[in-house]
């Protein structure tokens, strides 16, 4: 394979084919063609995937106005690097947007803080050029004191974590066909991201970061952990970049800023996400699996109605080492 196949239409033809073309496997197979060509990922150290701690500023208060344009309505998410706010665009009547806050580590040196700001603006510029139906559109970015902001479309709907919890509370599973439909849309978004120059990695794919709109469209949200892969510079790290969520994080993403990731790392996280959607429970962490491989329970043990092909595809996407995937 010399270049990835692209598009939901291509995927829809392949999904009914052999095991290597089902949802998670197809996406990881495609991603392998865009993997970093500077060398194989090395074995990382077992660091904390959430990185170091620093003082987080309190959330902005409702009715705060930023850039004389955006009025904060409410906080809709909060993490270790800042908050996400539902906001009103005062220049465009009736438009609501999401403000993604990325705080500067004030414990770092002035030079490091300036480098972080410069990196934020370079990468935010790339994100603003992205245009895909399964990604929220980034329309603006700016700095306000020790806070940087991305302005994105506000995506209405329910995240897939809530959909899984709803099914679980009823003693049911989300239908396999439905999950594969979502997977097709996610694959299309990831192939688009990974095909950029340089490739854009999401690095925090999980059910809570995937929205299902009232129209049935999947949106991969929360660009706050994005990393750009710059050729010959594996150190390209940004204040935008986080470490991911341990349950969905591949082994190569551990080790702090020294962890080596490429598009196949996103595919692992997609596989782990599909595992959760299909079984009603997240998979064992990669670090635990490295020490005790049997900790990963086969999906069909938890949900016997799953097809063997889908189970094998999910497990393939969750291979412990990226090089285990055939190119």
Please describe what each predicted stretch is.
Residues 73-80, 84:
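Protein kinase glycine-rich loop
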Residues 247-327:
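C-terminal lobe helix-coil module of Hanks-type protein kinase domains
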Residues 182-183:
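Activation segment signature within eukaryotic-like protein kinase domains
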């Amino acid at each position: 394979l010399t270049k990835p196949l692209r598009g939901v239409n291509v995927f829809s033809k392949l999904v009914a084919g052999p095991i290597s073309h089902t949802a998670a496997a197809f996406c990881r197979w495609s991603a392998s063609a865009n993997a970093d060509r500077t060398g194989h990922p090395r074995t990382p150290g077992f660091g904390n995937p959430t990185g170091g701690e620093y003082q987080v500023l309190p959330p902005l208060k409702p009715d705060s106005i930023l850039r004389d344009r955006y009025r904060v309505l409410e906080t809709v998410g909060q993490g270790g690097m800042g908050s996400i706010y539902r906001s009103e665009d005062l220049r465009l009547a009736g438009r609501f947007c999401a403000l993604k806050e990325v705080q500067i580590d004030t414990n770092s040196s002035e030079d490091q803080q300036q480098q972080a700001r410069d990196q934020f603006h370079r990468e935010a510029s790339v994100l603003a050029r992205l245009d895909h139906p399964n990604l929220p559109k980034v329309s603006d970015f700016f700095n306000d004191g020790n806070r940087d902001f991305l302005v994105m479309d506000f995506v209405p709907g329910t995240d897939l974590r809530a959909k899984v919890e709803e099914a679980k509370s009823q003693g049911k599973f989300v239908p396999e066909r439905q999950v594969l439909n979502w997977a097709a849309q996610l694959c299309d978004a990831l192939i688009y991201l990974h095909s950029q120059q340089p490739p854009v990695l999401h690095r925090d794919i999980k059910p809570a970061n995937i929205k299902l709109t009232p129209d049935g469209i999947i949106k991969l949200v929360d660009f706050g952990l994005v990393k750009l892969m710059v050729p010959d510079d594996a150190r390209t790290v940004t204040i935008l970049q986080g470490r991911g969520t341990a349950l969905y994080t591949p082994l190569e993403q551990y080790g702090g800023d020294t962890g080596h990731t490429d598009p196949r790392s996103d595919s692992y996280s997609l596989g782990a996400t599909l595992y959760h959607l299909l079984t009603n429970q997240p998979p064992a962490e990669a670090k635990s699996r490295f020490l005790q491989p049997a900790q990963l329970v086969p999906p069909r043990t938890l949900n016997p109605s799953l097809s063997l092909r889908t189970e094998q595809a999910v497990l393939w996407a969750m291979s412990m080492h990226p090089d285990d995937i055939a190119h």
